[in-house]
């Protein structure tokens, strides 16, 4: 499928030199690496050593000329950090071309609703993302706010319109947030998936 772009969201822990070489060979992959602040705040949610693994992965991907950025889950606790000049400068220094921002959504057993951003923080991110993207005074990284930037992609792109999600089991889902599937990438071609009732 060389005429299709594939984008993967990853925790980056399995990215090594062999992986990067294979990505260069294939040529149609880009990546969003999970990152939720500097080492302390990131590793408190992602696990000890994750921050260092993400930094190593970025260095390797940069060395091989791959296209990558970050996927940032912002919470009440880390919002100021992940929108700070210092954090954005680190991303730029590490070769990130973009940064997706998703607000924390508590789900499942043991959910932590106290981490949801406040209404004031939700307003602030809209303003701050636009400051970062500005031609004057902005940063050399393209930032997108998943919940508030629909105007730039024509609204929701899911359901096969421009995008669908493949989970870790290979199930094709309309969206990363909608866990329904009637087809699996192991048993169906991409065209068959897009022609299945869930995507039509």
Residue ranges of predicted features:
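Short, acidic, Ser/Thr-enriched surface-loop or helix-capping motifs
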Residues: 93, 166-167
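Short acidic, glycine/proline-enriched helix-loop-strand junctions
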Residues: 4, 50-55, 68-78, 107-142
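Active-site-adjacent beta-strand anchor residues
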Residues: 9, 35, 175, 183-184
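Short, small/polar residue-rich loop motifs at catalytic or cofactor-binding pockets
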Residues: 157-161
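Flexible glycine/acidic-rich beta-alpha junction loops that bind and position SAM and/or redox cofactors
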Residues: 77-79, 98-119, 142-155, 179-182
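C-terminal accessory region of radical SAM enzymes
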Residues: 120-151, 176-200
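Radical SAM/AdoMet-radical enzyme domain recognition
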Residues: 1-102
